[in-house]
Regions:
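Glycine/proline-enriched, intrinsically flexible loops and inter-domain linkers
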Residues: 1-730
Length: 730
């Protein structure tokens, strides 16, 4: 909303990372560390309540949540204890703005400073004690006072005003900024940064009369927007705000004196600084650290335990079904959602990316995806960064991007335990440089991101748990045709072939994998991308296949490895399976083949198109291997040499779904979660057009442009607290 002179958010994303929720006894990987005396909430409570908050906000604001991720992790290596006791909760999203409004205007003396939204309360005044200091360092009162919150219904009203102004022929907004960290002092100062401004504190809305001047200036009640408006347009903006039931306050103006001040009614200025003091060049900070080599034991395994390994991997929260998340959030509001999480006739959350259309009838859209690899980053921070970018891109590749990789922009959010132990600052530098170098080689930009560099939880007994250094990469790009997005659901057609396409150009490695995690290991040998140019070529070759409609189904290889990818392609169906032969893969270690998380994808191609597909891949110099074909049998047969293994799809799907059930039963009532677990596979969705359907408006006498009145009148009521009115009106 705060981009340029105003923009339109369309859909949201969310990521949750915690320590193990321990929803069921008997999971050996959850027994490596003892249960701690959690400072505020248990991991299980955080997973449920945090996702409730994201879901509730999206439902109230009218913004669908269409893409997300979950990771749980704990580990002990010698005396080092790792885990997301200090949790990560990331919310993001996609939207767009007009070219006219993409850049902020230049403020001039006399522009009015406007705040739209709710009142000031004692919210978020604990400073950086949540994001910039180890949790547990300060008293619980200070830490809890740092918690922010936002009123979705109020923010929707503020958004309606911004949207209305952006849709006018002449946008009166000079500049706009959201209220986040540091409240008014941050938001309003950035509006007037180029010329200075004076804020009348008596005009700021006060919801709590006991607030001090500092609390009024710096609280983080986040359902507000700050705008710089041309003076002659103030009354017009006020009328728009009144129509939208959005509280609007003219709280100051730009001055031209290059000072930024808050002034009370009695003339006292509790805050008065030169703009240069706030935004001038900061003194250089020198951080001295040294590289510390840490080694992580590799997992030991036996092929004879393959089925046990697989059932364990499928139960990890990062791999398992996310139905407990998707069944409680709106994934379709706006009427512009072209791809959300749930796929196939069983509508299971399997999508690699989320896609929105820009309007109700056009083909253009926006795709978004996520990537992270913190386990790998423990052993090799550079590889962890590369894998995070790679996962985001192999998730995004299924949408036909308007200009291939040139359409893609990334956001990198860094959560790192700096100063928690020697060598972490150096590891962060290595990780950031690796991500920068990889993206430069791919010729994609990373224009935005955030950081939290104190990812350590300290306990009263003196113990501490270090969160793994983590970068979460969000990818977005313009889509040329939302109808061409490839689904991960296998098409039950024996006249098709399944291929593996390698993006890593690296040997198969188990370090940093979900497989290693279930064995309580991390492993020193982690995969990476050995050739960024090759990765780019592979991405663009697959994009060509997508644009030409040559891929029937496709899925990325990430958490859980190749075997999880193959199973997930079958989970959303009620019939059919695969017969897979791995002899053409050079690696002889079956466990590595099935569970390594080297970047790559699996595609299904019609036999009549396979020569064209091969030609495109070979022309691009991209490696591929034929894996097998779909079958009528409800299992996946995997053979390597003389050995053959059978995996029952329906059984493995229940194993995969069980973790969702265990979390769902904690958030639902009256045994609903159990009923859903017992019946989710019994209700395949079928949709068929009438035999005479031609797919044309004219068949039903409908003019999509509404040039001829129908004579029927309908009223759409739009009031505060409502959403979805535009799609209903259309």
């Amino acid at each position: 909303m705060g981009g340029g002179k105003g923009s339109w958010p369309i859909a949201g994303t969310a990521v949750y990372m915690t320590s193990y929720p321990r929803t069921e006894e008997g999971r050996p990987w959850e027994e490596i560390l003892p249960v701690r005396k959690w400072l505020y909430q248990t991991p299980e409570q955080i997973l449920i309540k945090a996702s409730n908050g994201a879901s509730d906000f999206g439902n109230k604001f009218g913004q669908p949540l269409i893409c997300g991720s979950v990771l749980t992790f704990e580990h002990k290596e010698k005396d080092e204890v790792y885990g997301y006791d200090k949790v990560i909760m990331l919310a993001g999203g996609v939207g767009y703005g007009t070219q006219r409004d993409c850049l902020k205007g230049t403020p001039e003396a006399g522009n009015k400073v406007v705040v739209i939204g709710g009142d000031n309360y004692r919210i978020g005044l604990g400073g950086g004690s949540v994001s910039s200091v180890d949790t547990g360092r300060y008293s619980s009162g200070i830490e809890l006072n740092a918690v922010q919150r936002a009123n979705a219904e109020m923010q929707k009203r503020a958004y309606n005003v911004v949207r209305a102004l952006c849709e006018e022929e002449t946008n009166p907004v000079v500049s706009i900024h959201d209220h986040g960290s540091a409240g008014h002092v941050n938001c309003l100062s950035e509006l007037v940064e180029e010329c200075g401004g004076l804020i009348d504190m008596s005009k700021l809305p006060i919801g709590d009369t006991t607030l001090s001047a500092k609390e009024i200036i710096a609280n983080e009640s986040q359902e507000r927007m700050g705008l710089l408006i041309q003076e002659e347009a103030i009354e017009h903006v006020r009328k728009v705000a009144e129509r939208e039931r959005a509280p609007m306050y003219v709280v100051g103006e730009t001055t031209g004196d290059h000072r930024f001040a808050f002034q009370q009614a009695d003339g006292v200025r509790p805050f008065d600084l030169a703009v240069e003091q706030m935004f001038g060049s900061s003194p250089k900070t020198y951080m001295v650290d040294k590289t510390v080599e840490r080694h992580y034991e590799m997992p030991q395994y036996e092929v004879s335990q393959l089925h046990e390994y697989l059932t364990n991997v499928l139960q990890l929260e990062a791999v398992a079904c996310k139905d407990w998340l998707t069944n409680k959030v709106d994934r379709s509001v706006t009427g512009k959602i072209a791809r959300q999480q749930c796929q196939g006739e069983l509508q299971l959350p399997l999508s690699d990316c989320g896609v929105v259309a820009l309007d109700y009838r056009g083909e253009k859209g926006i795709a978004t995806s996520l990537g992270h690899a913190p386990q790998a980053a423990l052993a090799d921070p550079a590889a962890g960064s590369v894998l995070s970018v790679s996962e985001a891109l192999t998730n995004l590749v299924w949408a036909p991007l308007a200009e291939g990789l040139d359409s893609v922009s990334l956001s990198a959010n860094w959560m790192w335990p700096c100063r928690s132990q020697e060598g972490e600052d150096a590891r962060l530098y290595t990780a950031v440089k690796a991500l920068s170098d990889f993206c430069c080689s791919l010729q994609i930009n990373v224009p935005t991101g955030k950081d939290s560099l104190s990812m350590t939880q300290k306990y009263p007994d003196g113990s501490k748990v270090i969160s793994p250094g983590t970068v979460i990469v969000s990818a977005g790009g313009e889509v040329s045709d939302v109808k061409k997005v490839v689904s991960p659901v296998l098409v039950n057609n024996e006249k098709t072939t399944i291929y593996h396409i390698d993006f890593s150009f690296d040997n198969l490695k188990l370090g940093g994998s979900a497989f290693a995690q279930t064995l309580g290991k991390v492993g020193d040998e982690v995969p990476s991308v050995q050739d960024a140019e090759y990765f780019r070529d592979a991405f663009l070759a697959v994009q060509e296949l997508v644009n030409k409609g040559l891929i029937l189904a496709g899925h990325d290889i990430s958490a859980g490895g190749l075997i999880t990818t193959l199973l997930e392609m079958c989970f959303a169906n009620v019939e059919g399976g695969m017969e897979i032969n791995l002899d053409k893969i050079k690696e002889q270690d079956l466990i590595k083949i099935l569970f390594a998380e080297n970047p790559g994808i699996v595609i299904q191609v019609s036999d009549k198109h396979k020569e064209a597909v091969k030609q495109i891949l070979e022309d691009a110099g991209v490696g591929y291997v034929k894996l097998g074909k779909p079958t009528d049998e409800r299992h996946i047969l995997v053979s390597k040499g003389d050995a053959t293994y059978q995996f029952g799809i329906d059984y493995m799907r229940d194993v995969w779904y069980s973790t969702s059930y265990l979390l769902d039963r904690k958030q639902s009532m009256n045994g609903s979660a159990k009923k859903r677990f017992e019946n989710y596979k019994m209700q395949p969705v079928e949709f068929a057009f009438m035999p005479d359907f031609k797919g044309k408006f004219s068949q039903y006498g409908i003019d999509p442009d509404r040039r001829t009145p129908s004579g029927i009148r309908a009223a759409i009521i739009r009031e505060k607290g409502t959403n979805g009115e535009r799609e209903m009106a259309y």
